[in-house]
């Protein structure tokens, strides 16, 4: 009731079940701890609700597949919430690659490292599937898969674990069938109590490279990326970026109202789940 009054909502619910039982509710956004995504996505879809669910949809490919089967059985939409995938910044970088600006992609490197969290945070607890791979690494896995449109043949990974048995720092190297390589590092190791984050990317091609920062940025503003050619020329391009969460919700709304294809498809979510599962197996999570 306090939340309703503060933000001016029409209704407040005493439980998730009460919300799902309301026939006026058409869609829900699930941002619960990782261990609860699967359970409540299933309950919501069986109640006839469209579901936008935070990443990761589930801890393994098998459960991700089951979620999409449940969506089809109940004639509802399910989309994994990767807000940054809706960003004009990512769209612009993808277009540079598609247009051949840097030639054939040879190598992708990315990093997403944030401040340390206190021990009570759900990201730091094994029982809620915490750890940097589930929380941050999925940005780099999805970025790599989205740019290369193929899955790696070989995955090597190593991690540093905390006392709570979650990965605090993970590094991954991937090799693809045609010789391409990709690597990333994710972590929650920057100084505690400082609102700091490092997220950056580099894409190297046969004719040049693209470098950028804040690829997972979710606020209003401008973002820039730099194109460097093999001849040594350099160009900085700036992109206006609105709030990615808004773009994500608007796109999901169009799926419901206009049967638009989800920006993050079932096929993509399954590919990403497979890759994350391989990484977690490699590091012994």
Q: Predicted segment positions?
A:
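Predominantly a Rossmann-like dinucleotide-binding segment in NAD(P)-dependent oxidoreductases
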Residues: 84-163
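C-terminal helix-rich "cap/oligomerization" subdomain common to oxidoreductases
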Residues: 6, 27-29, 177, 237, ...
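Hydrophobic residues in well-ordered beta-strands that form the structural core
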Residues: 13, 53, 78-80, 109, ...
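Beta-loop-alpha module in the N-terminal Rossmann-like domain of NAD(P)-dependent dehydrogenases
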Residues: 2-70
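Contiguous beta-strand/loop segments that form the cofactor/metal-binding neighborhood of enzyme cores
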Residues: 142-218, 249-260
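C-terminal capping/lid region of NAD(P)-dependent oxidoreductase domains
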Residues: 76, 103, 281-285
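Rossmann-fold dehydrogenase core element
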Residues: 65-84, 104-107
